[in-house]
């Protein structure tokens, strides 16, 4: 029996949730997650649907759910027994999250590390402490770990994980539509919460420079992402722009409208200082939209030759000049669009699922 641990899946839309919805449907294994009543359930793969779980009705379980501690509120051995299964039948446990099932340390487990951002660009001391003091236990319990980039793999090694236990499996994407053939205007899009690692001040510096030195820019930068620790700073920077009306702060958009905004934008921007992968950049490339991104290791790892890079901590002049070049030079826009689309074609979800399946199969054979 193979178990897929989904106890850390939170309600609503998130990057982690999107990862589950892309990957888990292609994997064999009984799904372990919270049911409508806030209790653990085991769902056969043929009966499972990739819908986010609800918030648990009880206050205690909802608290555990919020902090990815659900396993500590469940009697997992009893749940296994009530479903007619024995611990000895568990061949392997796979988690698309950075969580092992700590009650079963003797069962081979494969867990996924998407990033270690809380250790280097944390938004709270609580998150830093959780990663520094609690995540090492999950790493020790896991038999193997998936890192979604070589950058994350290197971070895991620095975190104390044996490099022989790490497998790098990058995110994949499905190309569902023909790429955009030409820019529809000069609008820009950034998908970023108001968190420290998203480095939104760099975008405001770039737009400020663009407005001052290229006043004919007629577009709008839309920053889509929920508020966070940096919201007061973001609001101050917004108001201080020469033309604040050219930047819109949007908490969220329905999926269809977000896609429409992306495809109608001249480019997607990402100024992050710390990421495990930065999936929105790949999403933009799958639509044929050029990307202008910060010069950080994980961006270089995947996007060298198919994106334009700007410093994360300069005065904004490089980003501004790149945007001017993109507006003026249609051939540059076309080059970035085509090279980005080619990168997206090379990173498929099917290949990602196949690599994960190999790792799960290897665990099953070792038990």
Residues covered by each model-derived region:
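Carbohydrate transferase catalytic cores enriched for Leloir-type hexosyltransferases
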Residues: 1-367
